[in-house]
């Protein structure tokens, strides 16, 4: 059961077999899980790239992944401040990382999401950016994303195992030389696609991504696209969702500017409360901050329980 709950809702079986309930009496609870880690990482990067100061409410900043992301974004030039009310204020770089000519190294330890997102974001640097991590991260393949960045004009170098961190990304000297079309013959991680999608609005010509193989964890790509749309980016997708077109700096209103945003509670964590209520007749578990417009695929979990 626990392993099932860790999967995106779209991968859940049509009918769930629930074990006997540990609680025999009905209950009625209202819960608010911590902010979504997936949304936090996406919003941190977008706010750091935007122009002006964004206000983020409810981010999961205590998680090690988020701390690594924030530290790396500071190195790249973004500024972070904790407001008295608990909001996180992020002053972005308007799509231009402040990297010295000699480059920088970002040690992301074991933060996989930050590793993938910042590898793609290195396209927006004026100098080399080396993505590194701990021993375990140095064994995790990132070559598929490296190949995509190479096809867009970046020079990619690996200092250790082929296709694994440490990976140095050297963007083209001329930002206008960055390509605007990339194909993924296979998709080892949906985060590779999300990483490029998050960066695309700041590319001069935007980006078209063609997904040719099986797509893993597609609900997280949908999350990224909907988040961009909520911030005013005119993303277009084909009917089969295999082609994703994201406009660049010179199109429409341009990339996102400073924004105010509330991070949704983590829907994956909420599934435990919903499942517990489903096992006890007459019980009710309500999750504040999650509704029908949630960006998270796991927010559909109650609908699966009702089938």
What kind of region is each of these model predictions?
Residues 1-307:
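Structural preference for solvent-exposed beta-strand-turn elements
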């Amino acid at each position: 059961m626990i392993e099932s709950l860790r999967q995106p809702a779209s991968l859940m079986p049509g009918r769930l077999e629930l074990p006997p309930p540990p609680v025999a009496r009905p209950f009625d609870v209202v819960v608010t899980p911590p902010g979504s880690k997936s949304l936090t990482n996406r919003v941190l990067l977008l706010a750091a790239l935007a122009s002006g100061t964004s206000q983020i409410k409810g981010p999961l900043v205590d998680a090690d992944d988020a701390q690594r992301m924030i530290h790396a974004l500071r190195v790249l030039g973004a500024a972070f401040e904790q407001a008295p009310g608990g909001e996180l204020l992020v002053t972005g770089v308007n799509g231009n990382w402040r990297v010295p000519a000699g480059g920088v190294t970002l040690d992301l330890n074991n933060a996989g999401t930050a590793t993938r997102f910042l590898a793609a974001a290195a396209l927006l640097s004026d100098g080399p950016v080396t993505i590194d991590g701990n021993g375990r991260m140095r064994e995790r393949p990132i070559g598929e994303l490296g190949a995509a960045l190479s096809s867009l004009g970046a020079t990619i170098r690996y200092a250790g195992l082929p296709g694994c961190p440490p990976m140095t990304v050297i963007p083209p000297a001329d930002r206008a030389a960055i390509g605007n079309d990339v194909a993924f013959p296979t998709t080892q991680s949906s985060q590779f696609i999300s990483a490029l999608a998050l960066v695309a609005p700041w590319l001069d010509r935007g980006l078209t991504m063609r997904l040719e193989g099986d797509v893993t964890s597609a609900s997280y790509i949908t999350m990224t696209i909907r988040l961009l749309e909520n911030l005013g980016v005119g993303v277009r997708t084909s009917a089969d969702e295999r082609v994703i077109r994201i406009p660049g700096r010179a199109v429409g209103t341009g990339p996102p500017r400073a924004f105010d945003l509330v991070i949704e509670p983590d829907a994956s964590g909420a599934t435990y409360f919903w499942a517990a209520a489903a096992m006890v007749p007459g019980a009710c578990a309500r999750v504040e901050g999650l509704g029908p417009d949630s960006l998270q695929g796991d927010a559909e979990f109650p609908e699966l329980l009702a089938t």
